[in-house]
């Protein structure tokens, strides 16, 4: 069965056999995090089930659907082509092709698709009450390690609520309830119209003034700015609050773009391969004395590498630049370099590694992604992004997914370096910096490596260089997460963002004030707003007739959050059931 993106749930048969899971996808689970219950269940107009537990014909969805116009609603369809084999018995039991769907929280029989996952009535009501009443549960006496099952789900409410969040239940679905489809579409149109008006109001004069301003020009005083020719929205511009100076926004755009280019080595390789000539020392703007990002204290508590496992040799994040003679790669290989600065991959990136020379001895495909480092007569081949399709039949699905996770280890270091060079990021507290990186690294990698997903060939290229078809990966156990990642990448690639736009969007993804554990929310919000304004300015400058691109980019943020939750769930299952 073909899997679509988002909200795809792993289904377990009634025998609870771990060896025979099935993956399916209903219309109601499309694009993740839809609610199938109301925030006010006592209201007859806000519930999608009748007294017998059967679904009504009312087509409604959560407020999250307002952000995605292509979502559909009813979580359990009967007799419709979009959900073949999906039935719901008179007892409220949801089945798929004869298999009983279990609650993802406690394992009880699921009554439907509630708040983003299939759940039973008990867990649905528990989660709704927890969010609506903002209940602070008593601290767990077992270090929050209680196993939540049907028989004991009421013993530890803190662990039960934690389990609800970990499996993907959406807070927003409870907070906003459900909205009829027509109302959802109307709100979406109004939101897009308001966004377009806001951008036109704030930046109507910006496009004309760009040609008059030099890069080093200081900001123009408001009085002089109002004297310049403006479009028809002149009066509205004068009345509105003036945005930050264009010079400041251009400076932010330039700094973030340089940080993205300098710390995204995979993107550099593709730019170098696509151009016939390369300027000397392209992408080598990293300062010689880069202060290391010290996360050692956080590793002891399951820090960044708890999301991206790596070997012991890759966990040194506190080293400084030194004139070493060899570079350690994640696979254990070392590259000796003469008269160059290099360092362990888990430290900072070298300011100058070697002269990159295309390999003549490799195949045409490999030569575009392979480079030689000349070290006094010794030649070391480095092929980090070989495109040669290769599937090892001897490897199990677990080993392949472990390789997939391991291959991202150096990319995680790039995200850390990128974050350090975002204007204002280093001004945040160390605690907030670490929390933003821990929570947002996967989402940044998802944006950066969207090009690894080839929609035409239906393939995924691992960072180790191996290419797998989607069908092969599905046969190895990949399901909902891979399908969601593939669809997200296809949509993001369809926007055809420039390097500058991708850089700003990546920074916006990382700096999110609603991450858990943030201490100084106001500081993070201020930085986030600065980046969003810069992104809006850039989009309006590059696409004056396509204002919807900015809206579409912002709508990708909840998609990324959904993918992040799904990834955390898969990683947890990966650790518990290797």
UniProtKB/Swiss-Prot annotation:
Deacetylated by HDAC1. Acetylation and deacetylation regulate its transcriptional regulatory activity. The heme-bound form can bind gaseous signaling molecules such as CO and nitric oxide (NO) and NO can reverse its transcriptional repressor activity. Heme binds at residues 383, 567. A zinc finger (NR C4-type) spans 103-123, 140-164. Disulfide bonds join 336-342, 373-383. Keywords: Acetylation, Activator, Biological rhythms, Cytoplasm, Disulfide bond, DNA-binding, Heme, Iron, Metal-binding, Nucleus, Phosphoprotein, Receptor, Repressor, Transcription, Transcription regulation, Ubl conjugation, Zinc, Zinc-finger. InterPro entries: NHR-like_dom_sf (IPR035500), Nucl_hrmn_rcpt_lig-bd (IPR000536), Nuclear_hormone_rcpt_NR1 (IPR050234), Nuclear_hrmn_rcpt (IPR001723), Znf_hrmn_rcpt (IPR001628), Znf_NHR/GATA (IPR013088). Binds DNA as a monomer or a homodimer. Interacts with NCOA5 coactivator, leading to a strong increase of transcription of target genes. Interacts (via N-terminus) with KAT5. Interacts (via C-terminus) with HDAC1. Interacts with ZNHIT1. Interacts with SIAH2. Transcriptional repressor which coordinates circadian rhythm and metabolic pathways in a heme-dependent manner. Integral component of the complex transcription machinery that governs circadian rhythmicity and forms a critical negative limb of the circadian clock by directly repressing the expression of core clock components BMAL1 and CLOCK. Also regulates genes involved in metabolic functions, including lipid metabolism and the inflammatory response. Acts as a receptor for heme which stimulates its interaction with the NCOR1/HDAC3 corepressor complex, enhancing transcriptional repression. This is Nuclear receptor subfamily 1 group D member 2. It comes from Rattus norvegicus (Rat).
């Amino acid at each position: 069965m073909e899997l679509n993106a988002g909200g795809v749930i792993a289904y377990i048969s009634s025998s609870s056999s771990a060896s025979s899971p099935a993956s399916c996808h209903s219309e109601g689970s499309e694009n993740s995090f839809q609610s199938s219950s109301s925030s006010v269940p006592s209201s007859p107009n806000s519930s999608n089930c009748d007294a017998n537990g059967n679904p009504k014909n009312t087509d409604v969805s959560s407020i999250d659907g307002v952000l995605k116009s292509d979502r559909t609603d009813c979580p359990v369809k009967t007799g419709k082509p979009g959900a073949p084999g999906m039935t719901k018995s008179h007892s409220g039991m949801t089945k798929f092709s004869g298999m009983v769907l279990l609650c993802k929280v406690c394992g009880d029989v699921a009554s439907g698709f509630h708040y983003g996952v299939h759940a039973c009535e008990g867990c649905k009501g528990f989660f709704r009450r927890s969010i609506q009443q903002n209940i602070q549960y008593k601290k767990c006496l077992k270090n929050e390690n209680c196993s939540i099952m049907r028989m004991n789900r009421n013993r530890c409410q803190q662990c039960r609520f934690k389990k609800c969040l970990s499996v993907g239940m959406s807070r927003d679905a409870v907070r906003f309830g459900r909205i009829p489809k027509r109302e959802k579409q109307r709100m979406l149109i109004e939101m897009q119209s308001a966004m377009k008006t806001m951008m036109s109001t704030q930046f109507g004069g910006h496009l004309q003034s760009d040609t008059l301003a030099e890069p080093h020009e200081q900001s123009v005083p408001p009085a002089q700015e109002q004297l310049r020719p403006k479009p028809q929205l002149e009066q509205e511009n004068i009345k509105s609050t003036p945005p930050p100076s264009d010079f400041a926004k251009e400076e932010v755009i330039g700094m973030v773009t340089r940080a993205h280019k300098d710390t995204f080595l995979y993107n550099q390789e593709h730019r170098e391969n696509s151009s016939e000539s390369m300027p000397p020392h392209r992408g080598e703007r990293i300062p010689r004395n880069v202060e290391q990002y010290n996360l050692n204290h956080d590793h002891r508590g399951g820090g960044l590498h708890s999301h991206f496992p790596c070997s012991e040799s890759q966990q040194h994040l506190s080293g400084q630049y030194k004139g070493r003679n060899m570079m350690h790669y994640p696979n254990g290989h070392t590259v000796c370099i003469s008269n160059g600065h290099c360092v362990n991959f888990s430290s900072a990136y070298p300011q100058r590694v070697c002269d990159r020379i295309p390999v003549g001895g490799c195949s045409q495909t490999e030569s575009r992604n392979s480079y030689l480092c000349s070290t006094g007569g010794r030649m070391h081949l480095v092929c980090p992004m070989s495109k040669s399709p290769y599937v090892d039949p001897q490897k199990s699905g677990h080993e392949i997914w472990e390789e997939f996770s391991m291959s991202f280890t150096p990319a995680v270091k790039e995200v850390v370096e990128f974050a350090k060079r975002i204007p204002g990021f280093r001004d945040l507290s160390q605690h907030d910096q670490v929390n933003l990186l821990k929570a947002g690294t996967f989402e940044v990698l998802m944006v950066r490596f969207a090009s690894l997903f080839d929609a035409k060939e239906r393939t995924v290229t691992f960072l180790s260089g191996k290419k797998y078809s989607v069908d092969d990966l599905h046969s190895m156990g990949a399901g909902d997460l891979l399908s969601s990642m593939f669809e997200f990448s296809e949509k993001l690639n369809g926007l055809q963002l420039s390097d500058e736009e991708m850089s700003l969007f990546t920074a916006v993804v990382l700096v999110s004030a609603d991450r858990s554990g943030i201490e100084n929310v106001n500081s993070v919000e201020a930085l986030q707003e600065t980046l969003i304004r810069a992104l809006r300015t850039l989009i309006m400058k590059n696409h004056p007739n396509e204002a919807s691109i900015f809206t579409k980019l912002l709508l990708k943020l909840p998609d990324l959050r959904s993918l992040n939750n799904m990834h955390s769930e898969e990683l947890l299952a990966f650790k518990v059931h290797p």
